[in-house]
Amino acid sequence: MKNTRQFFHFLSYVQYPLMIVVLYYYVQVIISIANRDPDWSALNSALIFLGILVGFSTLQDTTKTQNKISRKIWESPIKGRIALWTISVLVLLFLISGLIGFLSSRENIHKEVSFGLIVLGIGMLGMLKGAIEMFENHRKDRE
């Protein structure tokens, strides 16, 4: 079991090269907006890679916290619940807006951006599962 957990924790490090990819597309989007010609295709790519990145980040070992801020959140019952509710709302917003956009849009580029929102929502859903595990593993009121 420990080897499997270590394998997935190691696999979670794929998130860091993906951050560079997301940053590349994000910069393209910002530059295109500054030029008053938004690059929707780059936005779609940024959303898709961000969703994949979030998915890989959830492969980390949930029995350990990554930093002091994370530890403070997951050890506190109130802060932990607030974090879980916030992530839940984001998941719903990304999934619902993506599905509505995908199903109601007639333009192909809108469908593509909506698909990117759906992928991000699915990645965030995995993050929510990991956050629930972190909360269960670290909360102080259950020791």
Regions from the language model: what does each represent?
Residues 1-48, 52:
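N-terminal signal-anchor transmembrane alpha-helix
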Residues 2-14, 73-90:
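Juxtamembrane helix-loop boundaries in multi-pass membrane proteins
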Residues 23-32, 91-115:
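Alpha-helical transmembrane segments and their membrane-interface junctions
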Residues 34, 63-66, 103-109, 138-142:
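Transmembrane helix-loop junctions in multipass membrane proteins, especially transporters and channels
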Residues 41-63, 120-126:
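Generic alpha-helical transmembrane segments
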Residues 53, 78-103, 119-125:
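Hydrophobic alpha-helical membrane segments
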Residues 58-79:
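Membrane-helix interface/capping segments
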Residues 114-143:
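Alpha-helical transmembrane segments and their immediate juxtamembrane interface regions
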